[in-house]
């Protein structure tokens, strides 16, 4: 790997009396990073699904067209996990994880804020493909980090705890759509329909993901 993605340089070994306490503190600090970082990946993993009813209601796309567009996500994610796993093993996970999160959030933010990014099936397919590709940068550095910081006898427990990040992150886009509905109601005085907030379904989670990338780093 090159530039900031290169593995972190070796540092001098700590005095023996500091190793145990420092190790315990740092590995939970690292765990917090991969836990909340991976949870934030789920902000923009499937939030496009929440925007689809609005796109249909607004008459912009049909269900069949959105099905074609959505196929890009699974294709890209599968390919990316295969490719990015090898790259992650040769990189600095502190950079690799938040960088993918930042780019994934950027894709969704652009789709929500810039009309050109949702102006046609082809461009939307590309944007969803890119988002799926960047999503593949989430799991590999997390798995590698847990292997490095926890022994074999501890990994079952730590991976089980880490796995709850999926659930925490997965519930947030729905909460953000509710927030968008509340903002629309306070601004317009009427209840929001799906066609009124489909953009927010994309860029609210996108912006949140990009913000989360900062403390994760």
Task: Kindly label every feature range from the protein language model.
Residues 102-118:
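C-terminal ends and interior cores of transmembrane alpha-helices
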């Amino acid at each position: 790997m090159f530039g900031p993605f290169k593995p972190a340089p070796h540092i001098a070994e700590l005095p023996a009396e500091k190793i145990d306490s420092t190790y315990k503190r740092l590995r939970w600090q690292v765990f917090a990073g991969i836990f909340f970082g991976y949870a934030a990946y789920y902000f923009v993993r499937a939030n496009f699904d929440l925007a689809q009813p609005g796109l249909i209601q607004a008459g912009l796309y049909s269900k069949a067209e959105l099905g074609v567009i959505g196929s890009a996500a699974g294709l890209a994610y599968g390919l990316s996990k295969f490719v990015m796993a090898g790259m992650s093993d040769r990189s600095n996970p502190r950079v690799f994880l938040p960088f993918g999160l930042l780019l994934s959030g950027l894709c969704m933010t652009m789709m929500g804020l810039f009309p050109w990014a949702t102006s046609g099936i082809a461009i939307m397919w590309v944007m969803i493909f890119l988002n799926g590709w960047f999503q593949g940068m989430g799991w590999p550095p997390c798995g590698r980090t847990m292997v490095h910081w926890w022994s074999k006898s501890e990994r079952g427990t730590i991976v089980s705890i880490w796995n709850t990040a999926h659930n925490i992150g997965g519930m947030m886009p729905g909460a953000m759509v509710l927030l968008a509905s509340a903002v629309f109601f306070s601004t317009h005085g009427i209840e929001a329909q799906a066609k009124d907030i489909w953009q927010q379904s994309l860029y609210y989670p996108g912006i949140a993901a990009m913000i989360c990338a900062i403390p994760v780093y």
